[in-house]
Amino acid sequence: MKFAYRFSNLLGTVYRRGNLNFTCDGNSVISPVGNRVTVFDLKNNKSDTLPLATRYNVKCVGLSPDGRLAIIVDEGGDALLVSLVCRSVLHHFHFKGSVHSVSFSPDGRKFVVTKGNIAQMYHAPGKKREFNAFVLDKTYFGPYDETTCIDWTDDSRCFVVGSKDMSTWVFGAERWDNLIYYALGGHKDAIVACFFESNSLDLYSLSQDGVLCMWQCDTPPEGLRLKPPAGWKADLLQREEEEEEEEDQEGDRETTIRGKATPAEEEKTGKVKYSRLAKYFFNKEGDFNNLTAAAFHKKSHLLVTGFASGIFHLHELPEFNLIHSLSISDQSIASVAINSSGDWIAFGCSGLGQLLVWEWQSESYVLKQQGHFNSMVALAYSPDGQYIVTGGDDGKVKVWNTLSGFCFVTFTEHSSGVTGVTFTATGYVVVTSSMDGTVRAFDLHRYRNFRTFTSPRPTQFSCVAVDASGEIVSAGAQDSFEIFVWSMQTGRLLDVLSGHEGPISGLCFNPMKSVLASASWDKTVRLWDMFDSWRTKETLALTSDALAVTFRPDGAELAVATLNSQITFWDPENAVQTGSIEGRHDLKTGRKELDKITAKHAAKGKAFTALCYSADGHSILAGGMSKFVCIYHVREQILMKRFEISCNLSLDAMEEFLNRRKMTEFGNLALIDQDAGQEDGVAIPLPGVRKGDMSSRHFKPEIRVTSLRFSPTGRCWAATTTEGLLIYSLDTRVLFDPFELDTSVTPGRVREALRQQDFTRAILMALRLNESKLVQEALEAVPRGEIEVVTSSLPELYVEKVLEFLASSFEVSRHLEFYLLWTHKLLMLHGQKLKSRAGTLLPVIQFLQKSIQRHLDDLSKLCSWNHYNMQYALAVSKQRGTKRSLDPLGSEEEAEASEDDSLHLLGGGGRDSEEEMLA
């Protein structure tokens, strides 16, 4: 089994905090999620998280005008220069302070960051290699409080900065003679956003109390004059012109510009002047909501403003005409962005973790996604590996598509936290348990709750399991220590299993038999035979409280995680322990900021809380109260690999040792909330609360893994963590993993065999090299008529390799029919031999089924749409023929008009209709 799993995608979290950005083509939204960045492709309906992470939560993202580079800045002031083309980090930089916003100039040559009460302009990194990608050009002083927002003119000559001191500052990007800085007032609250007009120095400023000021400049952008150098600077410029090798030194030299709110009279003569044209108020009706975010589209003069109540307004400037107003959320709108065409508007709500894209002309949603409000607790893969269902403490059950990364259905029937989720064997029914005392079954065809199972006395369910046939549903109680068994078809309670003396922590059915394993805090695991009248079969005694239990896919082994950080393996037939793993040293727990003891002593109370066997049963995945997920080899009982699921220092218990410089006689300085002034007052957290709402918007959640599952295909695994739903998958592009390689197998020999039309030998050598492009070249060189001959001569060992390659190729290749022919011939000619090894081949077959099913779903929609259109065309033609027979005296113009109408109804009205659609 391969262990080269890498981070693939982040689901369950669509927006945390920070600014949203549209890509230059306007089809994708870049959203910060924790310490990562996710790109939502709205055109292709797909989300993808970049394989990089910052040290703290992302605070702001700046996108270059060409869309190739992005600057990602976290809460600690660390910046990453990221290439969005190759999805890799190019440069690290530390701004030595908290950065509020970052913005590239429209020409892409410079960018400005607002840090503290200053603004700094840097030379943007170019296309050539540089030792220092960020070179400081100028530092602008002037505001007395924190700077909040930036906007550039279209020609990149000037930029405007808003501040919390209620002032707006216009700075020149160059040393202009008539504009170095200009301070504007007129507001009574902090500036939220400021924007320049298109091809003008006129600007708009918006404050937090809902006031818009329009400022007119008496000078056009072309009227700005460069200040001639004098004194030693003129001599320096002359020397640099003579010496070509020192040409770039002036650009590396930092310049400081200090602005004054009330400059002297002699400084105003011959300078640019601003005057206020108008002042508008958003809160006219007495609904005094704070303005929290704004965006302005310069070409269409469209202003979008978001408020703390979840309402947004669309205005047309400069007349300030209200286009429409809408409430999209119950929480404050944290960020607003408009795409390049001005059609789509993106909203981010940090309170609920919502991301919405609104098309204002048609008044419809392009994207509407929301993660779990509280932490996710449980997850389960569908049998084909295409869907993932998650349950959270917020009582919601969400179903995610692993291919697109989007949630397509949310069930809200539970009134309390969800504790367990599972799929039935068919993959169309989801069964969940909750603390509200119900177990519910949801239908994924009609998206409804069709069964609700309850107990005779109200109880809180902590776990749920469904047998292989999907007929028996069982759930464990947390307070009555009982296990309830229901029938899926009738919904009736079949039996109540008693015997445990502590809360039930886990349930699992044997995949091959109707045997139920239950783990409890009473230090036992009990095996129950569902077809036996006495029910109980065996009792396995443990050395500590049981926290998780799982069966191997073939049902021949049972794994149990206990409170003393051990994983024990049992033979369920003979009730004999076959092995154990000591995992305390592999957890590597951290020290929380409120802990009075060291991480070494705190590790005695930490353990694995989630277990899952791999698809082949040779290894087991374990995670729990730690930032690490471990893969153990079951037979050898050794650690194979350990994955660090997060490096986000904004979470608690990430580091083993606390920072001694923050430890004082009054306590830890890290516990003081630095951002408390940004919200309305300070919310005090409830004492003793470990998860949930915490009563405070400012808290550091503890890093932990609540659930783990391997995909049935065996190529990826998922984990529900404090960060969200993380998916790790095998990346074969960067891994050279040959199979039975010797010195005679080279790419040259493969191509030589192809030239000699020895296709079987070429395919075998390509499979031994295990290079995907070489295998693709060898398979696609086989003529269609010789596929059956080549497949019949392949050894059985290599048939599995070809099937695995075909399953992965279905996701990216356009040769659908060709690869389907290969799959059909392989399964028909080698089906009987493959059936004898069904257990080991099951992940490959499920991976193949998942890939083919996706193509079937896509093509069936298109074919159904064409089929219905053809039926409609036939019905219209029959109706027109009947009309002609009844009214033969109709004119030719009427007949042509009726034909045109029918064609327009079908969406094929010729060139004129296409021009109308384009217009």
UniProtKB/Swiss-Prot annotation:
User: Which CDD domains does the UniProt entry name for this protein?
Assistant: WD40
Query: For the modification Phosphoserine, which residues carry it?
Result: 898, 902
Q: Which UniProt keywords apply?
A: Nucleus, Phosphoprotein, Repeat, WD repeat
Q: Where are the WD repeats?
A: 12-50, 53-93, 94-132, 142-181, 186-225, 286-325, 328-368, 371-410, 413-452, 456-498, 499-538, 541-580, 603-642, 700-740
Q: Can the keyword Nucleotide-binding be found in this entry's annotation? A: no
Q: Where is the composition biased (Acidic residues)?
A: 240-251, 890-900
Give one GO term, molecular function aspect. Answer: RNA binding
Q: What ranges does the record give for the region Disordered, renumbered to this chain?
A: 238-267, 882-919
| Taxonomic superkingdom | Eukaryota
| Main location, first listed in the record | nucleus
The cross-references to PROSITE patterns, in alphabetical order and at most eight, read:
WD_REPEATS_1, WD_REPEATS_2, WD_REPEATS_REGION
Q: Which GO terms describe its biological process?
A: maturation of SSU-rRNA from tricistronic rRNA transcript (SSU-rRNA, 5.8S rRNA, LSU-rRNA); ribosomal small subunit assembly; ribosomal small subunit biogenesis
Complex and partners: Part of the small subunit (SSU) processome, composed of more than 70 proteins and the RNA chaperone small nucleolar RNA (snoRNA) U3.
Which family, according to the similarity comment? Belongs to the WD repeat PWP2 family.
Task of the protein: Part of the small subunit (SSU) processome, first precursor of the small eukaryotic ribosomal subunit. During the assembly of the SSU processome in the nucleolus, many ribosome biogenesis factors, an RNA chaperone and ribosomal proteins associate with the nascent pre-rRNA and work in concert to generate RNA folding, modifications, rearrangements and cleavage as well as targeted degradation of pre-ribosomal RNA by the RNA exosome.
Q: What is this protein called?
A: Periodic tryptophan protein 2 homolog
Give the species.
Homo sapiens
Source taxonomy: Eukaryota, Metazoa, Chordata, Craniata, Vertebrata
